[in-house]
Amino acid sequence: MLEGIIRESISKSAVKALRNDGYLIANIYGKGQENTHCAFKKNDFIRAVKSKTNIIFPVKVGGKEINVVVQEYQKDPITSDLLHVDLMLVQPGVETKFLVPVKTAGSAKGLKNKGVLILSKKRVKVKCSPENLPASYELDVSDLDVGDAILVRDLPELPNVKVIEKESVAIVGVIKAK
């Protein structure tokens, strides 16, 4: 489990000192909860996020174990190092917006006809409670030929999960290679 420390000071100099010690600055917030300013070891955080099987993962901060989801992160534009991450507290029964990953399965027919598979949306925004949150959307692309696409409206409908995207937006498609 990922363990972090609570930041006593939120000043610029304290943030610089933590970053120089290899920490990633983070904020944990939730509906009706007080914000928690904390820091995680950068390499431990990256390892934990890459190895998680679900969008929701547990962290331990200040002796308390809480379930969170990565809401937003900031990267250095030059070095691509993580600078800051916002973690949202997952509260049972509270409907929240999540970004659910999209995964493709199969090999598209259009690839044999000189086509290229393009994944336009890697994540789809949904609104639901954490209990109903899907781990990912699995899309079968084996029937896609050149010029075909799977749109948001073609996603499987899940109970108590509302997709908050325009229905005409393409998620994955096969285009003709030049």
From Swiss-Prot:
Part of the 50S ribosomal subunit; part of the 5S rRNA/L5/L18/L25 subcomplex. Contacts the 5S rRNA. Binds to the 5S rRNA independently of L5 and L18. The keyword RNA-binding applies. The keyword Nucleotide-binding does not apply. Gene3D superfamilies: Ribosomal protein L25, beta domain (2.170.120.20), Ribosomal Protein L25, Chain P (2.40.240.10). Pfam families: Ribosomal_L25p, Ribosomal_TL5_C. The lineage of its organism: Bacteria, Pseudomonadati, Campylobacterota, Epsilonproteobacteria, Campylobacterales. Belongs to the bacterial ribosomal protein bL25 family. CTC subfamily. HAMAP family: Ribosomal_bL25_CTC. This is Large ribosomal subunit protein bL25. GO terms for molecular function: 5S rRNA binding; structural constituent of ribosome. Keywords: Ribonucleoprotein, Ribosomal protein, RNA-binding, rRNA-binding. This is one of the proteins that binds to the 5S RNA in the ribosome where it forms part of the central protuberance. GO terms for biological process: translation. GO terms for cellular component: cytosolic large ribosomal subunit. InterPro entries: Rbsml_bL25/Gln-tRNA_synth_N, Ribosomal_bL25/Gln-tRNA_synth, Ribosomal_bL25_b-dom, Ribosomal_bL25_C, Ribosomal_bL25_long, Ribosomal_L25_dom, Ribosomal_uL5_bac-type. It comes from the Bacteria.
